[in-house]
Each structure stands twice: as C-alpha cells, then as structure tokens.
Amino acid sequence: GSVSEIELEQVKQAYAAVGIEMEVMDYKVAVTQQKEPTEEEIINGCKNAEIILATGNPPITRKVLESLPKVKFVQRFGAGVNSIDLDAAAECGVIVLNLPGFCAKELADVAPAMIMGLIRNTAYYDREVRKGNWPKCKYLLPPDVRELTLGLYGFGLAGRYLHDIFHKGFGTKVIACDPYVSNAIKLQYPDVDFVSFEELITQSDIISIH
C-alpha cells in the first residue's frame, strides 16, 4: 500500500507504546510511494515479501498474487477488500485479512453533518455570509428532521451508529434495508422497521447508504 517513512515510524512508536517491539519479529519493511501503486510497482516492491500490509486500495490482482509466490498474507487496513482478488488469493493459498468496523464511528459522525447540511442548506448560507451577504431564506422552509424518516441501506456498524445519532438524538424515525443483518441484531433494535428495498426508497425522506 501507500505509506510514508514518517507514518511507518508512527506505527512503530504506537506498537512500542503497548509493549510490542517490531524489530524483535526479525522483519524487513519495504515502503511504496504515497500515491496508489500500480500492479507493476507492487510486484517490483514486494518481490521478497511474505506479508503485504495494504493501505488505501492497492490492486492486489491475480497477476500480482501469481507474481509473488512468497506472499502468504495480505492485510487490508480497512473493512473493504474490493481491490483484492479473493478467488485468486484462495487459489494461491494467500490468507486475506481486513479490519471489520474500521472507521465506522467516524463515518457515522460525518453522515449527519452532510444530511443536516442538505436539509438546512448550510453550505449555501456559509458561502454567502463569507461574501458579506446575509440572505434570507430563498427556498421553502427546511423540514424538521424530527418529523422525517431516515432510511438506512445497510445496517452494519456505521448504520447502527447513525441510527443512534438520529433516533436517540433527534427522535427521527429510522427504517432499514439489509438482507444480511442477523435476527439477533434486529432484536436489539425493536424501534427500527426492517423493510424491502422498494419500501425503503418509497418511505424514506432521507436515504443513507452504508
């Protein structure tokens, strides 16, 4: 992946702070450039690697995996593995690891800001005030978020955090569509109506995709 020497040193210091000395693992680290590397750059930079630590979305393709027979593990620093060819990894005997829930709270913090910004048109008023203008409302009065229905497409960690912010914070009604959510999770959220995709898009005033 893409990581700088400074970031690598920060990682080493973080490990050391909790009693883990990376040097005792007898490892060597190859650092790629900041931009997202190409297939060729990954192959050339990881010729002797046994583990690839992937930040960003580097293309860990079949070509890459077949060109690096020493690689045994690919660790993705994030939840998604969409840039990794999982079928090729399985065929090559490479174990792929990810970090479920990575930045879920941070994502759930940003989503309400964007939603409220759209409802209240804050970006427009911010620009105008910075220009020295103090415009009165030129559009319909914004709706009260407490009277709206928030539809969550995906009810993983980020979706559940967002539910807490809107339902517990504003009293907003929340519905969700997620074919993979377990019954155990559903039982923990009796206030959420789990609906079909068609019902989600017809009943929601706001839709947030997770």
Predicted regions and their residues:
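N-terminal glycine-/charge-rich "phosphate-binding" loop or analogous flexible N-terminal tail
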Residues: 1-49, 173-175
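Short gly/ser/thr-rich secondary-structure transition/capping motifs
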Residues: 31-37, 54-56, 130-137, 187-194
